[in-house]
Curated annotation (Swiss-Prot):
Pfam family, one: Rotamase_3
PROSITE patterns cross-referenced by the UniProt entry: PPIC_PPIASE_1, PPIC_PPIASE_2
EC top class named in words: isomerase
Gene: surA
UniProt lineage: Bacteria, Pseudomonadati, Pseudomonadota, Gammaproteobacteria, Enterobacterales
Protein name: Chaperone SurA
SUPFAM superfamilies named among the record's database cross-references: FKBP-like, Triger factor/SurA peptide-binding domain-like
Biological source species: Shigella dysenteriae serotype 1 (strain Sd197)
UniProt function note: Chaperone involved in the correct folding and assembly of outer membrane proteins. Recognizes specific patterns of aromatic residues and the orientation of their side chains, which are found more frequently in integral outer membrane proteins. May act in both early periplasmic and late outer membrane-associated steps of protein maturation.
Reactions catalysed according to its record: [protein]-peptidylproline (omega=180) = [protein]-peptidylproline (omega=0)
Domain annotation PpiC: ranges: 171-272, 282-382
Location within or outside the cell: Periplasm
Length: 428
């Protein structure tokens, strides 16, 4: 399931969602700054949303409401794409191919199977590629612009890490859906009251059994409205603070809200909860090595043979590993320490070096090993299990703060871009 950090921002790169191919005769649906949204764009996304809803057996609102949601989505996309063009943001064919391959993999399909599925659904593959490229540009522009506005202080990381550490062994994750009833910038009291009344009415409908996904499609101003407001799984600490507080005692099936923020009133549905172990232990290795690099005066084969001779001298007692490293090793970072690499996790090393190291027993020396750096003799001195919970908690705290602030700042940023853009809707 997709992560809510991505879904909250509306990056809907799913294998069965794409715009239909443009029609020969087209009209302008909206003017956005110096660009346009075409009727074919609106009709194409309408087709995709209806197709997805049918496959998911999800009810949709009436066409007028759905069209309004789609128009707002396309207007926002156009605004951000124009920013990307000015910034020179480009997605290479290689990046695009990799993204599409990942989408196919996430949907348990080969690339050919996905192309066949798109064709079966009446969706043009080249048009699909273009839409994924657009979504990637939108994502990059949004991420770059929003992250520039975020500051995370060391004290914040320490405080949240301590909170995480004081929790139970299993930290809670939630699967949420979200509805946003928006407020304009500097709203009047009447506008606030009207939005709050609408939000409370939606909460009442949801608590009385109305389909939350249909309510989201009909009323939500969030970018994921067309996905039924689905945010997916994530930790409670990754949410904006006002959400986390409101969800601290929530149970599966709860409808939470309305919650007031700077951009409007939020309604959340807790689809599910689950726990996750926080104990983190890693194995570190203490190793040393002797490195010989092939050069114009030493061929690759000569370097290997030289290391074999050094290994034989160490085994016979003619020299020690440390002495040989100081005399022969061409690794400037470890030669003077007798080749000692200190304590580290094995995954930081070159793959060939790592694989050879993990096959050694304590006190054992390898045969010559070839890596991207040259030829090595490796000796495993010791291993240990290290509790990395504290470091992991700080790393997690930083990511949680980034995700939380990103969600809050992204909503404000998008509202600002929409308010400052010239938009004229020409059709209804």
């Amino acid at each position: 399931m997709k992560n809510w950090k991505t879904l909250l921002l509306g990056i809907a790169m799913i294998a069965n969602t794409s715009f239909a191919a443009p029609q020969v005769v087209d009209k302008v649906a909206a003017v956005v700054n110096n660009g346009v949204v075409l009727e074919s764009d609106v009709d194409g996304l309408m087709q995709s949303v209806k197709l997805n809803a049918a496959q998911a057996r999800q009810q949709l609102p009436d066409d007028a409401t759905l069209r309004h949601q789609i128009m707002e989505r396309l207007i926002m996309d156009q605004i951000i794409l124009q920013m990307g063009q000015k910034m020179g943001v480009k997605i290479s064919d290689e990046q695009l191919d990799q993204a599409i391959a990942n989408i196919a993999k996430q949907n348990n399909m080969t690339l050919n199977q996905m192309r066949s599925r798109l064709a079966y659904d009446g969706l043009n593959y080249n048009t699909y590629r273009n839409q994924i490229r657009k979504e990637m540009i939108i994502s990059e522009v949004r991420n770059n612009e929003v992250r520039r506005r975020i500051t995370i202080l060391p004290q914040e990381v320490e405080s949240l890490a301590q909170q995480v550490g004081n929790q139970n062994d299993a930290s809670t994750e939630l699967n949420l859906s979200h509805i946003l009833i928006p407020l304009p910038e500097n709203p009047t009291s009447d506008q606030v009251n009207e939005a709050e009344s609408q939000a409370r009415a939606i909460v009442d409908q949801a608590r009385n059994g109305a389909d939350f996904g249909k309510l989201a499609i009909a009323h939500s101003a969030d970018q994921q409205a067309l996905n039924g407001g689905q945010m997916g799984w994530g930790r409670i600490q990754e949410l904006p603070g006002i959400f986390a507080q409101a969800l601290s005692t929530a149970k599966k099936g709860d409808i939470v809200g309305p919650i007031r923020s700077g951009v409007g009133f939020h309604i959340l549905k807790v689809n599910d909860l689950r726990g996750e172990s926080k104990n983190i232990s890693v194995t570190e290795v203490h190793a040393r090595h002797i490195l010989l690099k092939p050069s114009p005066i030493m061929t690759d084969e000569q370097a290997r043979v030289k290391l074999e001779q050094i290994a034989a001298d160490i085994k016979s007692g003619k020299t020690t590993f440390a002495a040989a490293a100081k005399e022969f090793s061409q690794d400037p970072g470890s030669a003077n320490q007798g080749g000692d690499l200190g304590w580290a996790t094995a995954d930081i090393f070159d793959p060939a070096f790592r694989d050879a190291l993990t096959r050694l027993n304590k006190g054992q020396m390898s045969a010559p090993v070839h890596s991207s750096f040259g030829w090595h003799l490796i000796e495993l001195l010791d291993t240990r299990n290290v509790d990395k919970t504290d470091a992991a908690q700080k790393d997690r705290a930083y990511r949680m703060l980034m995700n939380r602030k990103f969600s809050e700042e992204a909503a404000s940023w998008m509202q600002e871009q929409r308010a400052s853009a010239y938009v004229k809707i020409l059709s209804n």
